[in-house]
């Protein structure tokens, strides 16, 4: 009996560290996706016509906030980053709090909501990136990635980070749900196992 309590406490501590590491990775991925896309901007000057021998130039700017899907992407990634930051702080500094009952359920529900949010944002941005890269002949939308290559490369990097965040949040959500079945005092510094002979 005492040995099983010690084993459970050791396993609980190890799973807490893994969950904390996953949250740190998810926080990094979603925050970097939000920052890269939020700072994504490229300005270029093109010749749009000629009057005689004089070229007429126009300056165009590609920014993330020109597309509502990219704005949603930045906001959603920032929200998921904030959620993970709160959960990390709670896990590190909330040593006296027991994660049982309603608290575990609320964390699991929030994790699932954040998986849904970041997945929707990443897929919406991926759709717009596809249109930007290849255009749409039926709607007569021209592609822009052949003209704004840096803008598209930064957007692709943000999408990769966001999809990494989606995968990490799926794993975190599964771990949160599994903790509902076997609740423990995750990362509790005050609880120490007692050995009873």
From Swiss-Prot:
Statement: the UniProt record of this protein carries the keyword Protein transport: no
Pfam families with a match to the protein in the record: CASP_dom
One Gene Ontology term, aspect cellular component: plasma membrane
The keyword Cell membrane appears for this protein: yes
Positions bearing N-acetylalanine: 2
Domain of life of the native organism: Eukaryota
Transmembrane segments: 18-38, 70-90, 107-127, 157-177
Extracellular side: 39-69, 128-156
Compartments it resides in: Cell membrane
Swiss-Prot/TrEMBL keywords: Acetylation, Cell membrane, Membrane, Transmembrane, Transmembrane helix
Signal peptide: none
Residues exposed to the Cytoplasmic side: 2-17, 91-106, 178-197
Membrane topology of this protein: Multi-pass membrane protein
PANTHER family reported for this sequence: CASP-LIKE PROTEIN 1U1 (PTHR36488:SF8)
Family according to the record: Belongs to the Casparian strip membrane proteins (CASP) family.
Subunit structure: Homodimer and heterodimers.
Protein name per UniProt: CASP-like protein 1B1
Organismal lineage: Eukaryota, Viridiplantae, Streptophyta, Embryophyta, Tracheophyta
